[in-house]
Amino acid sequence: MKLIGVAGTNGAGKDSVGEILAKEHGYMFISVTNLLRAECTKRSLPIEREHLRAISGEWRREGGLGVLVDKAVELYRQSYENYQGLVMASMRNDGEADRIHELGGTMIWVDADSKVRYNRIYSRQRTTEDNKTYEQFLSEEKDEMFGNPNDPTSLNMAVVKEKSDLIMLNEGNDIATFANDLAASLRSLNLL
């Protein structure tokens, strides 16, 4: 199984990587964030970052640090014959990066300048949480980058970045150029 985990800062283009690989290269795309959003809806909770973090922490405590990867792989295995591989977006805990590697997969880190990312998030208005100040955006990002050192189930994106095999910068707004750069990088790793 070809397995790609995608991590990165908010608004950098993690879902874009998944969508490109699904549309242009036949991968199944699963957003871990969408799994968590669905669980919020199931529990009648507002879809807010604090609830997403709480549920992901709960699942990690119950099922291990790689549980979100395992949930996505389980979904993939139900229809794998229809796909070239699995791409998962929004890895935010180092146990998820470790699990991707244990399964023979590759981790990609996607990043962009904080102002570029803030403007993307603010303009898309995916949820009411996207309507925040730049300072709030940076504060939340800091919390997610470094997590709680006393809680291995917390978000710790800085360590996920360190464990990534490929770093992609997505500074522009030209999705075709980004898709071409992504494809070239993945070909060099024999993933396309």
Report the location of each language-model feature:
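Extreme N-terminal starter segment of soluble prokaryotic enzymes
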Residues: M1-I4
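ATP-binding Walker
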Residues: A12
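Walker A/P-loop
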Residues: D15
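ATP-dependent small-molecule kinase phosphotransfer cores
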Residues: M28-V87, M91-D98, T127, E135-S139
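Conserved phosphate-donor/acceptor-positioning beta-strand/loop module used by diverse small-molecule
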Residues: A89-S90, H101-K132
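Small-molecule kinase domains that catalyze NTP-dependent phosphoryl transfer to phosphate-bearing small molecules
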Residues: R126-D181, S185, L192
